[in-house]
Amino acid sequence: MAKNNVVKAQGTDLYFIDPDTHVVMNAGCITSLSGIDTSIDQIETTCLNETARSYVAGLATPGTATFSINTNPQDPVHIRLLELKNAGVSLDWAVGWSDGTSAPTAVLDSSGEYDFDVPADRSWLLFEGYMNSFSFEFAQNAVVTSSIGIQVSGEPVLIPKSTS
């Protein structure tokens, strides 16, 4: 039986807000994206008279997201990503799912910060984080690629596509 209730990865876009210009930039030809996650720490609540440990949920610990690109030193977005990684600045990120094609915009919020304004005709995963690695890979019979790590800060927010 064919499954029609899946979302394909092909057609996914990764965006970030440039902190200097407040322009939304598309990371371009990403080839993979993973690890946008938080794990829940455990707090032990075991009493000495118990024979098995017991726990309650603690704080969420954000993980490290990773995305890969076919690196091009002539692509101004790739150069800007490397500059921002080297500066260690935290960025707002938006993953646009393949169930739509609209791009987000940046809007000034009431506290004077720029945030994403995401169209309702596409699903979104929003998160904050700084790039903590930007490696270059050179291999035989291949294009130059980069694997870029993002230390996620806070809880990612999933915004489903509007059904209306």
UniProtKB/Swiss-Prot annotation:
InterPro entries: Phage_TTP_11 (IPR032495). Its main location: virion. It is found in: Virion. Keywords: Virion. Gene3D superfamilies: 4.10.410.40. GO terms for cellular component: virion component. Disulfide bonds: none annotated. Pfam families: Phage_TTP_11. Structural protein. This is Structural protein 3. It comes from Pseudomonas phage PAJU2.
